[in-house]
A protein has these predicted regions:
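Per-repeat structural element of leucine-rich repeats
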Residues: 13-14, 39
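A detector of tandem-repeat and repeat-rich interaction/domain scaffolds
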Residues: 1-7, 13, 27, 31
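Extracellular beta-strand/loop-rich repeat segments of large surface/secreted proteins
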Residues: 20-121
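Well-ordered, non-membrane alpha-helical segments in soluble/globular domains
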Residues: 3, 28, 83-93, 132, ...
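Short loop/turn motifs at secondary-structure junctions
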Residues: 10-11, 25, 36, 50, ...
């Protein structure tokens, strides 16, 4: 599959990670930084969506529409706040509601601690001409990269209304993987310090 990285960029035309007409696509479009995508339609592939992934590493982005993505992964930055919107779609290119039916949706916070509390709600997608989605979307972070080592882990409930896809924080907990790493690092430092003390006592230092 192909990968397109859009970082701190301005794009006004269509963006397509692939144009194949058969087989699995497995393309990735990654958006980060202060990207301006007004009127741009973002395609995982022109004809197929199998394996295609949209990665959102930022918030406050406006685009024309998205199409042909099997996976929608939202990596919320640590400056995300209650009430923020990640992706706004004006829908003008197609003139129809945005369709994300059947998409695997994953939401996680990356980087440092975010100022989110249980009950806070983030709008992942605001589709101005309407949103067609599964009745009960579920947060599935399988396949999301770079979220295992963060110190806090946020749980999200997903919900929709006729124009929006929401993620509401349902829990905030310490990541046991990050705790294990921290304890291992502290143990290593203690071992180094102990070794230095033994060397000093032996008159070697």
């Amino acid at each position: 599959g192909n990968t397109i990285n859009i970082q701190d960029s301005t794009v006004t035309a269509a963006i397509s990670a692939g144009v194949g007409t058969s087989g699995e696509a497995n393309n990735t479009v990654s958006i980060s930084g202060k990207s301006v995508l007004n009127n741009a339609v973002i395609f995982g592939g022109m004809f197929h969506k199998t394996g295609n992934t949209l990665q959102m590493h930022t918030s406050g982005v406006t685009a024309g529409d998205i199409a042909n993505f099997e996976n929608l992964h939202f990596y919320l930055p640590n400056n995300i706040a209650n009430g923020d919107t990640v992706l706004t779609l004006d829908g003008q290119a197609f003139g129809t509601p945005t369709d994300i039916t059947g998409a695997n949706i994953g939401v996680a916070v990356t980087g440092g601690k975010a100022a989110l509390q249980p009950g806070d709600r983030i709008t992942l997608i605001n589709a101005e001409l309407g949103l067609t989605a599964d009745a009960k979307p579920v947060n599935n972070t399988s396949g999301m990269k770079g979220i295992q080592g963060v110190s806090l882990r946020y749980g999200f409930d997903l919900s929709t209304d006729p124009n929006n896809l929401y993620a509401t924080v349902n829990k905030v907990e310490t990541n046991p993987q990050a705790k294990t790493f921290s304890e291992g690092r502290a143990g290593g430092l203690a071992f180094i310090n102990q070794g230095a003390d033994l060397i000093s006592e032996a008159g070697i230092a």
